[in-house]
A protein has these predicted regions:
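Bacterial N-terminal signal peptides that target proteins for export
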Residues: 6-30
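Signal peptide processing junction and immediate N-terminal pro/mature segment
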Residues: 38-51
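Bacterial N-terminal signal peptides
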Residues: 26-41
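Active-site neighborhoods of enzymes that stabilize oxyanions during catalysis
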Residues: 53-65, 71, 105, 173-246, ...
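Positively charged, proline/Ser/Thr-rich regional signature most characteristic
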Residues: 54-132, 140-145, 213-283
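Thiolate-centered catalytic microenvironments shared by cysteine-dependent enzyme domains
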Residues: 114-209, 213, 234, 243, ...
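C-terminal soluble interaction/assembly domains
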Residues: 282-334
Length: 346
């Protein structure tokens, strides 16, 4: 609510009654409180939505540069998601804890499937995290597809209830390019936490919810895959059929990146790119999906966390989950076309 100046009430006579000094002082104090409240409210509405580091004046996220990460206090928990992060003698950021991306994913037959909640809880507790722990997620940063790993884990942790999250933009590639310190010494295991999940299901789109919203103009189903997957010319190995969700529109997650770069560009650039999003009249919610919720996590992260688009959810199982359920699909090639595609791939 904005504060608005109101004219003083009209005097009841040509010469209004004189007020005591105490009365005038009370009115001045009341006016001061009102102006302070207005300024506070306006300041809150204009404040950036970065996460804070509890106990300090520093803020970070949802993206953080290598240089900024190097200045943060040691209480910030750095999670290394690289496949070889847990291997012996692997160079890493000092203080980083190894939790390879595969630890956060489903089985190879359906990688996008959410783990059972007790497994997520045990993993978060092992890393010593709770809902107030500031967390920075680090991947290799080699290419745009790699960004899906920290984006998916960021989404997972936010869904589980963690509040202070950031991704190292450009990952280890950016850290090494900045000539920042590395170590091969293993990080001591933290004291396990007593973390209890506080699920935010507004971030999650389940298969049944997607099925319910098919054809509904208020929900934009956004396919984050390359065009060939969207058109049914290619399919993920774990998917039972090629194609996409009925009524879906496509926006390849690669659009957010400069060619060959694993780091997101400036917010102003992302805003210009977002202006190219496909439009669906009446849509108030976006459901981001791909093959296994990996590329889709990048679209979700940029739209929801960086550009602050409201009502963006992720379908974690995506097309692998959907196609195996024998649910309706669009752009499904004929059997002959599928055989031809298989032959050409040999």
């Amino acid at each position: 609510m904005r504060c608005m100046n109101t004219p003083p009430p009209a005097p009841s006579s040509l010469h209004p009654p004189r007020r005591s000094a105490w009365s005038r002082l009370c009115r001045i104090c009341a006016l001061g409180w009102l102006l302070a409240a207005c300024a506070l409210q306006q300041g809150v509405s204009a404040a950036p939505s970065a996460s804070s580091v509890p106990g300090t004046a520093q803020t970070f996220g949802p993206l953080i540069s290598a240089q900024a990460l190097a200045t943060l206090p040691t209480q910030v928990r750095i999670i290394d998601l690289r496949d070889d992060a847990a291997a012996a003698n692997v160079a890493h950021i000092p203080g980083a804890l190894a939790a390879p991306y595969a630890d956060w994913r489903g089985p190879s037959s359906n990688p996008g499937q959410l783990l059972p909640l007790p497994r997520f809880t045990a993993l978060v507790r092992r890393l010593g995290l709770n809902t107030e722990t500031p967390v920075v997620l680090v991947a290799s940063g080699d290419d745009p597809s790699d960004f899906g790993a920290p984006a998916r884990v960021y989404w997972t942790l936010k869904w589980l209830g963690l509040k202070h999250l950031a991704i190292l933009n450009g990952g280890m590639t950016a850290w090494q390019a900045a000539a920042l310190p590395l170590t091969r010494q293993p990080t001591p295991a933290p004291t396990p936490s007593a973390f209890t999940p506080q699920l935010d299901d507004a971030l999650l789109a389940t298969r049944s919810e997607v099925a319910r919203d098919l054809g509904h103009p208020s929900t934009l189903l956004l396919d984050a895959r390359p065009k060939a997957f969207y058109l049914g010319r290619e399919k993920a190995p774990a998917a039972s059929r090629p194609g996409t969700l009925p009524g879906a529109l496509d926006f390849d997650n690669l659009h957010w990146f400069e060619p060959g770069s694993g780091a997101l560009p400036a917010v102003s650039t992302l805003q210009r790119i977002a202006a190219q999003l496909p439009q669906q009249p009446g849509a108030v919610q976006i459901v981001s999906f791909c093959n296994t919720g990996h590329w889709a996590a990048t679209n979700w992260f940029v739209l929801s966390e960086v550009l602050h688009r409201p009502h963006v959810a992720l379908y974690p199982g995506s097309m692998v989950d959907w196609s195996r359920a024998d649910a309706p699909m669009a752009h499904v090639p004929t059997r002959w076309q599928q055989l031809e595609q298989t032959w050409q791939a040999l």
